[in-house]
């Protein structure tokens, strides 16, 4: 879909080649983890307490919009605990045996990270309950009348689940997490620190004003700020002397069609469709998806959260409504 081509998409299949760079610039310690102060402070205490007791950290659920650092935080937790981390995702674990193979290969206090945990199948989820609660695995051996259940003891471990849809988790699964952390959109100042650190890791020349210009257009999302940094770097190397200042960043981002609010053509398309085609709303999600040629899930999970948080869009029981701020942004009269 169109969403996959967006430069400011928190999730995109078109930037897989840059994952290697992302891994290289990811922080490895809580001390280097910018923003999310409440999460960092709490996790520091929980990790130190678990280490003092020489126990596995309680199971941890991390939720929030895409691109905010859920995977990064999971890796930091494992690194701070001094244990191994095994990574998988909900859709990959199709059968109970897939999960059992991972669990039986864990060492004491290791971390098992499941991304998109809300997409686990009910069959796999049932196996996970006793593993989380009692560190035991219930396995069925054989078929028919000869089938029998055996219990396998597991070493203490920490399950870290990540999701963009905490509400989609079943209550039995959600209640088994001892620690629940919500990641919020980042402040511009925190993103400025992140982009300056990334520039340093990549060996780029960038001043604080250039970092601020990139940060304010990144929609509160670290993944986006790092992607914009790489595109601004390309512009600075080709059109300038390689140094990234505010003017260079502004020109590069304008060329990339990312405005001062962090909107790109998809954001403008969505808001303008509501204002011009549906008289400002309310408009239902099905009609809106058809009008802009995008999937409903993409609108709800990727496009809308930032627009709602910034006050440009309202999501009501009757449908979506463009706010006065949206009309003001586009210079359109109601």
UniProtKB/Swiss-Prot annotation:
Q: Name one GO cellular component term.
A: Holliday junction resolvase complex
Q: Which GO terms describe its molecular function?
A: ATP binding; ATP hydrolysis activity; four-way junction DNA binding; four-way junction helicase activity
Q: Which UniProt keywords apply?
A: ATP-binding, Cytoplasm, DNA damage, DNA recombination, DNA repair, DNA-binding, Hydrolase, Nucleotide-binding
Q: Which GO terms describe its biological process?
A: DNA recombination; DNA repair
Q: What class of enzyme is it?
A: hydrolase
Residues noted as binding ATP in the record, renumbered to the chain: 25-26, 67, 70-72, 133-135, 176, 186, 223
Q: What is known of its domains?
A: Has 3 domains, the large (RuvB-L) and small ATPase (RuvB-S) domains and the C-terminal head (RuvB-H) domain. The head domain binds DNA, while the ATPase domains jointly bind ATP, ADP or are empty depending on the state of the subunit in the translocation cycle. During a single DNA translocation step the structure of each domain remains the same, but their relative positions change.
> What is this protein's record name?
Holliday junction branch migration complex subunit RuvB
Q: What is the lineage of its organism?
A: Bacteria, Pseudomonadati, Pseudomonadota, Gammaproteobacteria, Vibrionales
What's the gene?
Answer: ruvB
């Amino acid at each position: 879909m169109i969403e996959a081509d967006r430069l400011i998409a928190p999730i995109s299949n078109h930037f897989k080649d840059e994952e290697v760079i992302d891994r290289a610039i990811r922080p490895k310690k809580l001390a280097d983890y910018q923003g999310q102060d409440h999460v960092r402070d709490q996790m520091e205490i929980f990790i130190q307490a678990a280490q003092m007791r020489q126990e596995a950290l309680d199971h941890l659920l991390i939720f929030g919009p895409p691109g905010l650092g859920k995977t990064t935080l999971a890796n930091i937790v494992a690194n701070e605990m001094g244990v191994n981390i095994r990574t998988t995702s909900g859709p990959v674990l199709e059968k109970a045996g897939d999960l059992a193979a991972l669990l039986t290969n864990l060492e004491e206090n290791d971390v098992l990270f499941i991304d998109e945990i809300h997409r686990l199948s009910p069959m796999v989820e049932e196996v996970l309950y006793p593993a989380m609660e009692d560190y035991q695995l219930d396995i069925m051996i054989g078929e028919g009348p000869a089938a029998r259940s055996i219990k396998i003891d597991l070493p203490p471990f920490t399950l870290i689940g990540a999701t963009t849809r905490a509400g989609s988790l079943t209550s039995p699964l959600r209640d088994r997490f001892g620690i629940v952390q919500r990641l919020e959109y980042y402040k511009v100042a925190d993103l400025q620190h992140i982009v300056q650190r990334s520039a340093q890791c990549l060996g780029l020349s960038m001043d604080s004003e250039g970092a601020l210009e990139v940060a304010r257009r990144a929609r509160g999302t670290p993944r986006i700020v790092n992607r914009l940094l790489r595109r601004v770097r390309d512009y600075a190397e080709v059109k300038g002397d390689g140094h990234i200042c505010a003017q260079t960043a502004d020109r590069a981002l304008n060329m990339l069609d990312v405005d001062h609010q962090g909107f790109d053509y998809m954001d403008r398309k969505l808001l303008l469709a509501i204002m011009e085609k549906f008289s400002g709303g309310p408009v239902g999600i099905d009609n809106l998806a058809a009008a802009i040629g995008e999937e409903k899930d993409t609108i709800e999970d990727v496009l809308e959260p930032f627009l709602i948080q910034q006050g440009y869009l309202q999501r009501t029981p009757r449908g979506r409504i463009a706010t006065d701020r949206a009309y003001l942004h586009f210079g359109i009269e109601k």
